Regions:
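A short interface-forming secondary-structure element
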Residues: 49, 62-77
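Conserved beta-strand segments that form the floor/walls of ligand-binding pockets within enzyme
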Residues: 55, 66, 111
Length: 116
């Protein structure tokens, strides 16, 4: 005699698999949406005590560098270059932190390598 499950339990494994696939597809759609939203945003950060302000897009494209007039000195080119590097790095760090936080909301904290 063959044991049979009641109808409500039949195909339960297939339903769970379909549910998991739909959930993964929705997560992928949410990830793409959040990525697009982040890339459309602008991020601004300052460095060196406000001597430089840098604006980048969420796609990490440098859009604007504002220097405090006190910074510009022909004899201080190396200092100016260091300040610009610090400003760019500060805004990239800001973008990465916000991106990671937004993606964590979508993935529920699951670490997906290469996502951000």
């Amino acid at each position: 005699m063959k044991a049979r499950l009641p109808k409500e339990y039949q195909n339960r494994g297939a339903n769970n698999m379909n549910s998991m696939i739909k959930q993964a597809q929705k997560m992928q759609e949410d990830i793409e949406r959040v990525k697009a939203e982040l890339e459309a945003r602008d991020f601004t950060a300052s460095a060196a005590g406000g001597m430089i302000e840098v604006t980048m897009s969420g796609a990490k494209v440098l859009k604007e560098v504002k220097l405090n007039p006190e910074v510009v000195d022909k004899d201080a080119i190396e200092d100016l270059q260091d300040v610009i590097v610090a400003g760019v790095n500060a805004v990239i760090t800001q973008i990465e932190e916000v991106s990671a936080a937004e993606m964590e909301k979508v993935t529920g904290g699951v670490n997906i390598p290469g996502l951000v």
